[in-house]
């Protein structure tokens, strides 16, 4: 590549994958709080399993992309969907 665009197949430098994963998980937690969606119990279980296995948030997002997309679509959360798309296409 001759341009300055970060290439995830070469390095994750300059992409801020961990920071973006943290932001998305914060957005998820905020949406889950006080929510009666069927997704809340699902994500609570998956987040607990992820923590128990010692996996990071980026690993969690990679494993849950489709479920996260469905939940954020259900919640009409365009910002979370945009960030999820960015993570999926630049970090996973």
Swiss-Prot record:
GO BP, sorted A to Z: nitrogen fixation
Record keywords: Nitrogen fixation
Coiled coil: none
KW Protein biosynthesis (keyword) present: no
Key word Transmembrane helix present: no
InterPro entries: CowN (IPR024899)
Cited Pfam families: CowN
Family in the record: Belongs to the CowN family.
Physiological role: Is required to sustain N(2)-dependent growth in the presence of low levels of carbon monoxide (CO). Probably acts by protecting the N(2) fixation ability of the nitrogenase complex, which is inactivated in the presence of CO.
Protein name: N(2)-fixation sustaining protein CowN
Species per Swiss-Prot/TrEMBL record: Rhodobacter capsulatus (strain ATCC BAA-309 / NBRC 16581 / SB1003)
Lineage: Bacteria, Pseudomonadati, Pseudomonadota, Alphaproteobacteria, Rhodobacterales
Recorded name of the encoding gene: cowN
């Amino acid at each position: 590549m001759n341009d300055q665009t970060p290439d995830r197949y070469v390095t994750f430098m300059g992409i801020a994958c961990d920071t973006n994963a943290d932001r998305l998980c914060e957005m998820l937690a905020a949406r889950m709080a006080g929510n009666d969606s069927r997704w809340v119990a699902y994500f609570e279980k998956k987040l607990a399993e992820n923590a128990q296995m010692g996996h990071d948030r980026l690993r969690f997002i990679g494993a849950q992309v489709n479920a996260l997309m469905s939940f954020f679509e259900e919640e009409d959360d365009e910002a979370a969907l945009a960030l999820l798309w960015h993570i999926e296409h630049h970090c996973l």
